[in-house]
Amino acid sequence: MKNVKLTLEYDGTNYCGWQKQKNVVTVQEEVEKIIGEITGEKIDVIGCSRTDSGVHAKAYTCNFKTNTVIPPEKFYLVLNSVLPDDIVALNSEEVPMDFHSRFDNKGKTYSYTILNRLQRAAIDRNYVYQYGHKLNCDLMREATKYILGTHDFTSFKSTGSKVKSNIRTIYEARIVEDENKVIFYVTGDGFLYNMVRIIVGTLLEVGEEKITPLNVKTIVESKDRTKAGRVVPAKGLCLEKVMY
């Protein structure tokens, strides 16, 4: 028996997130099914996190246990010959038997991409959130400093989340301008349900000068979901990196 770690890239457009659910297509279900066909085993793939419907990933990590004779470091090549076009395995390797993709990760980096122009996107329509109001990126950058560090992020969590604690630590948050795109990068030890998308919704209000950067500090301290911005669409969100 071996424990194999996979790194996947996927386009989440046609999937209802990572985690298996009844009557919908998910990334986990697709990957488990194909690995099972390759190995002839019933496979349980453990993911590093849940990604919501429509969210993308550039380096999603997962692991599974198998008795296959295929060398772990070659498994991704076999897998790619069968995976659909919107999922690709970037790497595979053998890891210790007690390695767990979710519980062993130390943090993640997400990006959220905003197309800041009046015209909607054609080519990138599934990967950016088109936002026509002109944004003040300097104010947005100033606002990000108020989410850095360890806080109770209740204000940035959608209802329906069942977690023991809303305390999370944000290590880095930055705004990058790339022509007419505004990209928000955030790295933390973990994220609450819709947390990144609500932070972005709040930063958009700062960018439009509806609220001040200092208001973000007040929103964090309030622990009140109604004080923060809206949940922006999933399609602009991408899991960039998982740290171990």
UniProtKB/Swiss-Prot annotation:
Check the record and name the PANTHER family matching this protein: PSEUDOURIDYLATE SYNTHASE, TRNA PSEUDOURIDINE SYNTHASE-LIKE 1
Q: Which GO terms describe its molecular function?
A: RNA binding; tRNA pseudouridine(38-40) synthase activity
Q: What HAMAP family does the record tag this protein with?
A: TruA (MF_00171)
Residues the record marks as active site: D52
Residues binding substrate: Y110
Question: Which keywords annotate this record?
Answer: Isomerase, tRNA processing
Keyword tRNA processing carried by entry: yes
To which protein family does this belong?
Answer: Belongs to the tRNA pseudouridine synthase TruA family.
As its record notes, the protein acts as a catalyst of: uridine(38/39/40) in tRNA = pseudouridine(38/39/40) in tRNA
Function per UniProt:
Formation of pseudouridine at positions 38, 39 and 40 in the anticodon stem and loop of transfer RNAs.
Q: Which GO terms describe its biological process?
A: tRNA pseudouridine synthesis
- Under which main EC class is this enzyme filed? isomerase
Which E.C. number(s) belong to this protein?
Answer: 5.4.99.12
Q: Oligomeric state and partners?
A: Homodimer.
Gene it is expressed from? truA
Residues in the signal sequence: none
Quote the protein name from its UniProt record: tRNA pseudouridine synthase A
Protein's UniProt keywords contain tRNA processing? yes
